Amino acid sequence: MDMATSNINGHGDRPSPAARFPTAPSVMTMNGNFASVGDAPTKEQYEHGIQVIDEQKEFNPNLNEYLQYTDTAHSGFNYHLISVFGSQSTGKSTLLNHLFGTQFGVMSERERRQTTKGIWMSKNKNQSSGASESETMADNILVMDVEGTDGRERGEDQDFERKSALFALATSEVLIVNIWEHQVGLYQGANMGLLKTVFEVNCQLFLKDKQSTPRSLLFFVIRDHLGTTPLANLKETLIQDLSAIWTSLSKPAGLENSKIEDYFDFAFAALPHKILQPDKFITEVQKLGTRFRAGRKSARAEDAGFEGGVFLPEYHRRIPADGFAVYTEGVWDQIVNNKDLDLPTQQELLAQFRCDEISREVLISFDAKIHPLEEKQGEDVRSGKPTVIADLGVTGKTARTSTIKHFETQASRYHKAVYTLKRTELEGKIDTRLKLLFHGQLLAAHKSGVASFSDAVSTAVKNGQKRAASYEFADIVEREKEVALKTFEAEMKSLYIEELSWTNFSSSYDLFEKDLNEVSGNLRKEEMRRLATHVERWVRSRLNDSIGVEFNKLGSGRGGSGAPETGEKPATEKDLWDRIWKTFTGTVKEAESKFIERAKSFDASEDEIEIGLWRLRRKSWGVLRAKIDEEVMEGNILLKLRENFEDKFRYDEAGVPRIWRPSDDIEGIYTKARESTLTLIPLLAKFKLLETSSPPELPEWIGNTPASVDPKDEEDLTPIGGVDEEEGKSLEEEMTVLSEAKRQDLVVRFKKTADGVYVEAKRSAIGGVAQVPLYFYGLLLALGWNEIVAVLRNPIYFVFLILCGVAGYVTYTLNLWGPIIRMLNAASTQGVEIGKEKLREFLKDSEVGRQALGMQGRDAGDSDAISLNTLDSRGKRVVREDEDVDEI
């Protein structure tokens, strides 16, 4: 024993633990410094590593947290996974600790028992094994230390051995097989049983996934190589044994003739004895570490099949690092429950899980940008005042692009079909919300645009009216319409997303333009109505003057004694209705020309102009008919008939006033004047033209109802007889000015008025017969001579007499005697009335008066004011409707 010991290092002592493995603890610790399954892990534990699966086959749920801590989770595909196999207590953990700087627990020199239970993982800590890039290890190498086989603790139970092998093969790129040189050529010692298990589970995987055919690298690390047997010979022996095992396997259908090289690549490395040659062992381990980097296949023998490193792209399982924990947990769940492991399905499930998770994450940022806009839009809609949100299109497009970009960056590394499906779903969710938001924005832009257009046109029209200047309505509409369309188009373009067909809002633009046309049409109709009202007012003003003048001409043709024997009326009376019709049609025609000229400036259609003219003619006829009815009202027509009669009775044919004498034929003149005036009543009773002796062609003049007329345009129109047949009123009735009853009543009243004039004339003729006798003047001179002389001698009386004479002459010259007499009569009558009123008040207020008349005193609250009464032309008191007449 002492000799053996002295041969170990040449000095008779074993190397110190630090020399054997500088990072491992001096005694077996069972990876106590790692984060085990069921523990509440700490950062210090994560510094060493994590137990992925414990000896009870429980998966560690904190694996993803460990990957986050080691900055591996966000590396995408830029990571590599290595698993180590080998018999128990053969130095697997020691190899990994030296090769990757890990701190897996190793076996104590004092004991020979199991140290690695379950599957452990640690990240490579020897990132730079050499100075140059070709000697630098790959980034993010994860190392799994798998529980050793042939352990006495498990005995014949090979269930965990098989499950762990299947797990490692499903997840790892490189499987390191740790064997001793003297075990090469053996079955159990060379781990051929374990490799057979690996091959069998590999066939199970390929049976489910024949299309992708993932490859793995079996990296044989031959320990304690003395050099007596060349590495090439050892390699050949191992490949022969592996091929024999592969041939003996029962392969799935379709794989009977497959070769082991179809599914596995092989790499070999030899390490010197760790204890006998510690320095050389460290050197070779460092050289071995440089092979763990990215590389590619090589046909040159000196490259050992690899150019560069051993991490070939086809070895990678293409599971993104952020989904590795979920994927491996799913794989282990399938394995531990003895289900057929379907890696493609697991990859799809992982992709679904991660894509959903990523989708939820990216939607959070999307929601942060979009939700406030949705809230504001919803509040505006609920308040009934939708508003256009500034920069909504830019915000929506930016949020959509960034959200999908982030999803693509993280999720595109997963199963392509699942990624494509989930991206479509994400786009659907985003686009659904954006669609509602964009449509709401366009609706608000639509409503606000229409309202702004209407307000702008109305404001421009009002400004034009205030300036009393002519304005072109069509130009205003066209200008404001162009502004509204440009604003809406700009908003529409801001919402356009090239790859989304539904953001092509051309139909919304067409609808907006259609609504603008409809609104402009309504505004034009309003302007046309305003124009029609203005023209109708102008027609009414003109007709009121001109028709009034025509009616005032009644009786202007002198009749009387100079009238023809036949009693025919002068031309000015016979053609009254012709003149009225001519004046009326001329006025309306002028109004029509003004209407057409102005309507064309509104860009009104032919139909609108036709309807406007039709309404104008009907309205104008209504104005004329109302004016005629006003002129032939009882008071007005009776006054005109009296004026006509007096004009013919009081004046001769030359227009000279008559001075009635007893010798004049008053009765004859009266009869002719009365009969001449009475003939006006039938003339005024019917609206008939002199030329045709029939009413004017009113229906033809008004015209037929336009086909495009709106029922609303007829609501304010008065029915016209002979035109509106459904009203049941004929043209004859429409042209009747005075009914038969009214005519008869008018004749009776006129005759009474004429009789009064005749009596007055008769009295004036008789009154002129009485004369003062001549002797009366002589008697007056004789008896009043003294007074005459006194007046003439007295300057005051004389001047007063002269002034009275001048005043009397002026009064006579100006014909003021009548008004003066009426004023005196009115004043005297008013004085009498006031006297009566004061007498009543005295009798009411006086105690003596009340006793005499048996009246009660009136209330103290009555007014003591004396009011002046309203008198008529004859000095009589006029009683107002709101005034009660006190009875004495």
UniProtKB/Swiss-Prot annotation:
Biological process according to GO: endoplasmic reticulum membrane fusion
Membrane topology label: Multi-pass membrane protein
Any GO molecular function: GTPase activity
Name of one Pfam family that matches: RHD3_GTPase
Biased composition (Acidic residues): 712-723
The protein's Enzyme Commission number: 3.6.5.-
GO cellular component, one term: endoplasmic reticulum
Compartment list: Endoplasmic reticulum membrane
Enzyme class label: hydrolase
Domain called GB1/RHD3-type G: residue spans: 76-315
Signal peptide: none
Binding annotation for GTP: 86-93
Ranges for region Disordered: 1-24, 703-723
Coiled-coil regions listed: 724-745
Protein name as annotated: Protein sey1
Organism: Sclerotinia sclerotiorum (strain ATCC 18683 / 1980 / Ss-1) (White mold)
